[in-house]
Amino acid sequence: MSSNFKNLYTSNNPPLQATLMRGSKLESIHKIHAVISDKKGRVLMCAGNPEYKSFIRSSLKPFQAIPFLSSGAASEINNASKSIAVACGSHSGSNLHTREAFKILWEYDIDINYLKCPKLIRSPLEHNCSGKHAAFLATCKKLKLPLDSYLKR
């Protein structure tokens, strides 16, 4: 990311920090190095180290949910905000989360066996990515695309 355009609006602040509390107990702390760049990769603004290397993993999920929203698939689901939330993030496989992922499939009359995420204890719905996968399938159904190859598109 190096260029003479670098650091135009760079912050000297440390990385952003998110803390997760479970009741009154601190469960985890996450340091966030954030970068805004132009289409040529020039750093326009950052918090923390703009050169920090990381693996994108689940932080990509909100972007992967864009077709779910832009196709209109999400808006056809009753109380869509919860479905959008489970499509945009990882979850712990709780009943609340698995029900929401299932609701996406139910609303689009999609069999659970189409889910390609690994089957965990009892069901692929318990996988932390099941909401994202359910949203992919709902989008395919909305756009009349094949469900069995949704990961290949």
PLM features per residue range, with description:
Residues 47-53, 85-88:
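Short helix/strand-bridging catalytic loops that position acidic/His residues to coordinate divalent metals
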Residues 42-44, 74, 144-146:
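Short helix-loop capping/hinge motifs at secondary-structure junctions, enriched
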Residues 1-51:
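Beta-lactamase-like hydrolase cores
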Residues 32, 62-67, 99-103:
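N-terminal, well-ordered alpha-helical segments
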Residues 56-74:
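Active-site SXXK
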Residues 35, 66-68, 139:
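Proline/glycine-anchored alpha-helix kink/cap motifs
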Residues 73-81:
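Phosphate-handling active-site elements
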Residues 11, 80-153:
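Active-site-adjacent helix/loop patches that line small-molecule binding or acyl-intermediate pockets
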